[in-house]
Amino acid sequence: MTPGRRTLGYESFDEVMPDVERLLQGHTQVGNWTLAQICRHLGAILRRHVYLPASTTFDPSDRVCEDQKRRMLETGILPEGIDAPPGAMPEATLSEAEKAEGLRAAIAYFRASPGPVTDHRILPLTRDEWDRFELIHLAHHQSFAVPTAAD
């Protein structure tokens, strides 16, 4: 685990934006991405999982086996160093507040959807498993930003 990274887990989408708002008050970056880049990436992935056509093909060698999927869903830990899909890598210079609002909108969009329709490296997933996966993914990236403001 990257030194300085915080232990973080979300049980509900309702926990995500209060954490982001706390980070906007002050934080230390311990990974490679800024808070704006993290928010941009997370928003893009949430939207991608809802609207990417189900007919999109993926490399079968990129699949996660059932044991890895089960372990990730049980532990809530997503390994570091997994490559992001094309189009989900954030630009270098972004506005934190703007991208935080984009993440808020993407979370609402995802929650209002009937469920992700995309093929994915960890398929098949139930809707509850998809929600769990997204919460794990959100916490994974947000854990690289450590709040400096007192609660």
State each model region's role.
Residues 13, 35, 96-103, 131-134:
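Hydrophobic packing residues in well-ordered alpha-helices of helical domains and bundles
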